[in-house]
């Protein structure tokens, strides 16, 4: 007789959960023992914090939802969010999905819950439990800056299942029109008042901490994720993310940090597309001139 059990995940479950993710089309973490840095190296993790829950059928893991503690600040108070990760259930056991996610919602340690990487399948479950999307109309809209038009168009057509030969032909025909856009990028206004320092996460200085203190002091009524140097190092200086070569573009004026932009590689092996993604961007007072200069420094 089949025995279904939901229990708190253990660090020893990492390999089995990784296998679960892979057989359900989720990449999972690139490095071994990724759970160590996700939780044990996390400043806001405690032994009382559940790292997630697993769904077992006869002692075989067939479902999982992770639970990462992330710090936010609002009205001068620190809030610890339970951030869901890798919510996945084998197809034949998805009738237990609500029971699994209910364990996540019943935890007592988190002040709020965040689902930052929901796909179409998991988002339908989140909606059933009344989770709300963030109040920003374009939060799920992707913007592209095309560097190699031929490769980009070819990859896009292949993703749409257009035959290889036809994709190649169309990409060469359309590429010149896209390249024209590249020629007019310099229409962005230039500014000599800013400097940009390019660094790896470990090279960050305490100027980032000064910037963070200014931002949170000037925005007490905004719900902000922690962006001090330690938080950035935790997120970007680990074996898993190092494979994506994170770089930080720090916007400086008179030797004072006014903002930063973090980029990582997210190449698509399946479609042969090389991609660099803006993973984080913040500037003092959300100044449009600073934002434009930061983006321009990266793109150009």
Model-derived segments and spans:
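A conserved beta-strand-loop-helix scaffold within acyl/acetyltransferase catalytic domains
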Residues: 4-87, 196-283
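Generic intrinsically disordered, low-complexity segments enriched for polar/acidic and small residues
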Residues: 32, 61, 90, 101, ...
């Amino acid at each position: 007789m089949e025995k279904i059990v939901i229990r708190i995940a253990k660090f020893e479950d990492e390999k089995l959960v990784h296998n679960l993710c892979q057989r359900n089309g989720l990449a999972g973490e690139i490095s071994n023992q990724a759970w160590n840095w996700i939780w044990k190296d996390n400043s806001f993790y405690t032994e009382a914090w559940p790292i997630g829950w697993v769904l077992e059928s006869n002692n075989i893991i067939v479902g999982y939802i992770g639970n990462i503690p992330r710090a936010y600040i609002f009205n001068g108070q620190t809030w610890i969010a339970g951030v869901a990760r890798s919510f996945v259930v084998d197809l034949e056991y998805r009738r237990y999905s609500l029971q699994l996610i209910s364990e996540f919602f019943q935890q007592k340690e988190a002040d709020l819950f965040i689902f930052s990487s929901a796909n179409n399948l998991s988002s339908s479950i989140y909606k059933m439990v009344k989770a709300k999307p963030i109040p920003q109309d374009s939060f799920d809209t992707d913007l592209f800056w095309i560097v190699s038009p031929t490769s980009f168009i070819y990859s896009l057509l292949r993703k749409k299942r257009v035959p290889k030969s036809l994709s190649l032909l169309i990409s060469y025909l359309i590429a010149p029109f896209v390249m024209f856009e590249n020629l007019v990028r310099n229409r962005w206004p230039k500014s000599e008042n800013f400097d940009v320092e390019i660094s790896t996460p470990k090279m960050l200085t305490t100027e980032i901490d000064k910037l963070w203190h200014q931002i949170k002091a000037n925005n007490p009524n905004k719900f902000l994720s922690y962006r001090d140097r330690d938080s950035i190092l935790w997120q970007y200086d680990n074996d898993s993310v190092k494979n994506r070569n994170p770089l930080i573009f720090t916007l400086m004026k008179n030797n004072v940090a006014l903002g930063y932009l973090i980029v990582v590689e997210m190449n698509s092996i399946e479609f042969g597309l090389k991609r660099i993604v803006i993973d984080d961007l913040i500037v003092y007072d959300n100044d449009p001139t600073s934002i434009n200069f930061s983006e321009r420094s990266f793109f150009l």
